[in-house]
Amino acid sequence: MNNTEFYDRLGVSKDASQDEIKKAYRRMSKKYHPDINKEAGAEEKYKEVQEAYETLSDTQKRAAYDQYGAAGANGGFGGFDGGGFGGFEDIFSSFFGGGGMRNPNAPRQGDDLQYRVNLSFEEAIFGAEKEVSYNRESSCHTCSGSGAKPGTSPVTCQKCHGSGVINVDTQTPLGTMRRQVTCDVCQGSGQEIKEKCPTCHGTGHEKKTHKVSVKIPAGVETGQQIRLTGQGEAGFNGGPYGDLFVIINVLPSQQFERNGSTIYYTLNISFVQAALGDTIDIPTVHGAVEMSIPAGTQTGKTFRLRGKGAPKLRGGGQGDQHVTVNIVTPTKLNDAQKEALHAFAEASGDKMVHPKKKGFFDKVKDALDVD
């Protein structure tokens, strides 16, 4: 057996996270569960999935498996180097009972879920309330999560006698060692369901569409998360639901940009407004604000509108809006505008690379030699 077969059984990569391994296990175990899949070979596949998950869900066993393969995960090495004592630690731990084993019958919280919600630029600044709808594993409505057919109850597992674990003998360099593994009949619950629920087929869960209202505070930004306790997937053995993490994605604005509580706006003005000054209505998310542009304003000059930015999530208060001036140079001029600009250049003493063309009256004066 190569060192990737267990990963292949679950359909995950070798660098998969524990969360990815857990989700893959749940998906594959449902796919091949003998009570659901009646095809030939499904039961064998189911056992292979159980074996793979038993190893990969345990960090120490997984490390030994990655290094030595199945023999390493089970404590039976063919050899080791100076850094390969992790497997022997597992052996002694199993033999002497060190480290203990998590109670498989204990209630376990359900998996967490993520949901991405899009907000407009303004919604992120002022806050909003959104109703989100998503599919999740919920407690079965027929059996209330017990997995048993209504009117019946689970019985003590005959293989593990309710402990949820069984003893397995393993051949190691030190001889035969006995270790405890999760019971493959009850999957660690300690109970066996003789008559399974017709809705959930004994899992105790069913996929349902769930809706929840999310209050989004003012001032949120892209990437921030809101945690909703108990809105994730159903737990196990009577454990609580997991949590829902709502991930914020703020859509861009056509007018503004934002960094934290500061909003940025680019104001395009003419060179006449820049030279002579003007009073202009500036758009903000809070409404238009009148702002004075002083005479002689240069392009790139930034003005601050205090309190016209986004709320500060921490510390309270309101950010500012920065208004940066951009002087727009006209690309098309009529004759009157050109004459006026040439006159301005002459009055300013500017030397033109291309002097202005003579007008009709100038040409007449030249022809008559009149000053």
From Swiss-Prot:
Its main location: cytoplasm. It is found in: Cytoplasm. Gene3D superfamilies: DnaJ domain, Heat shock protein DnaJ, cysteine-rich domain, Urease metallochaperone UreE, N-terminal domain. A zinc finger (CR-type) spans 127-209. GO terms for biological process: chaperone cofactor-dependent protein refolding; DNA replication; protein refolding; response to heat. Belongs to the DnaJ family. This is Chaperone protein DnaJ. It comes from Streptococcus agalactiae serotype Ia (strain ATCC 27591 / A909 / CDC SS700).
